[in-house]
Amino acid sequence: MSPTDPHSLLGLSPGAGEREIKHAFRRLAMRWHPDRNADPAAIEHFKRLRAAYEDLLAEYSRCPAPAAAPHDAQAADARPEPPPEAPPRGADRREDLVLTMEEAFAGGEKAFTIADEIPCGACGGSGEEVLRHTRLCATCHGSGRVRDGRSLTACADCAGRGYLSRQACGACHGSGQARAARKLHVRIPAGVLDGDELRVAGADEDCDRSGGEPGDLILRVVLAPHALYRLDGRDLILSRPVSAFRMLLGGELPIPLPDGVRHLKLESGRATTRELRVKGAGFPGRGKQRAGALIVRLVPVLPEAPDAEILALLEIAESRLQNTLSRHLPDVASWEERWLPDIPETR
């Protein structure tokens, strides 16, 4: 339709009735009448609107719209309308759910916030806002036409009207959408691992705009790095410094776990780096997967800068060890027996 066509100027479709023609002209006249619009180009545009209005009224008076034939209406009523199709189900939405080692170990409920896209409150989701005063289209300078090669075509920016009554919404920048935070409470099973997926059925309201069933929210578990623990499958591994004397003496050793403290029995006799392994005491089992083992790497530590009292006690212990060297320190005894007896002392 040409931008100079009377129907186009008044924003009407071909075949519009007298009432529609008058209503369209009154609406546009309120906007473009020189007494209401200070734009210098408003006078010429108003003249074009009046001319289009008069042409359409004259045409309508000569050729009024024909009334619908009765048999046509009956035929239309006789055709049953097909049932409306059910709106499609919304697509599933995927997000990452970051958990601490303690949260994944014990399970429970965790608050999770997601950002939904909702219709912009400023423009109602249209992406446009109505201008307080219409203005000439800057692309076609109010003519409604632009040159395309050797011909003139309707201006796409103003739909051939020559003026703009709307502009992109300043709040959503024309997208029609806004972001809104929504909080969910997600149940976390005990023993979830990095990469596991949790499905929250029907929780993706962001996909439920067409009236169909909302999609699911799928949360991929991401375990945050921990300063103490690491995982090998479901085996829970940690290193624990221990006094070398405690490793010699043995006894109970407190071990921190994600859900509390557990006391392990430490066998006496060796002050070397070694591992304690407790089957089933690691990460909890889930489904068909069994619980892992707790693996504690014990690292012996000697005292730094011992005071006089500790040195005296150590001297007593060392003297007694020297008396039973072959029993308690066999490596030292064999070495001294091999290399010391026949070597004369030097001054």
Curated annotation (Swiss-Prot):
CXXCXGXG motif repeats lie at residues 120-127, 137-144, 155-162, 169-176. Residues 68-91 are annotated as: Disordered. InterPro entries: DnaJ (IPR012724), DnaJ_C (IPR002939), DnaJ_domain (IPR001623), HSP40/DnaJ_pept-bd (IPR008971), HSP_DnaJ_Cys-rich_dom (IPR001305), HSP_DnaJ_Cys-rich_dom_sf (IPR036410), J_dom_sf (IPR036869). This is Chaperone protein DnaJ 1. It comes from the Bacteria. GO terms for biological process: chaperone cofactor-dependent protein refolding; DNA replication; protein refolding; response to heat. PANTHER family: DNAJ HOMOLOG 1, MITOCHONDRIAL-RELATED (PTHR43096:SF52). Keywords: Chaperone, Cytoplasm, DNA replication, Metal-binding, Repeat, Stress response, Zinc, Zinc-finger. Belongs to the DnaJ family. Binds 2 Zn(2+) ions per monomer. The lineage of its organism: Bacteria, Pseudomonadati, Pseudomonadota, Betaproteobacteria, Rhodocyclales. Its main location: cytoplasm. Homodimer. One of its GO terms (molecular function) is heat shock protein binding.
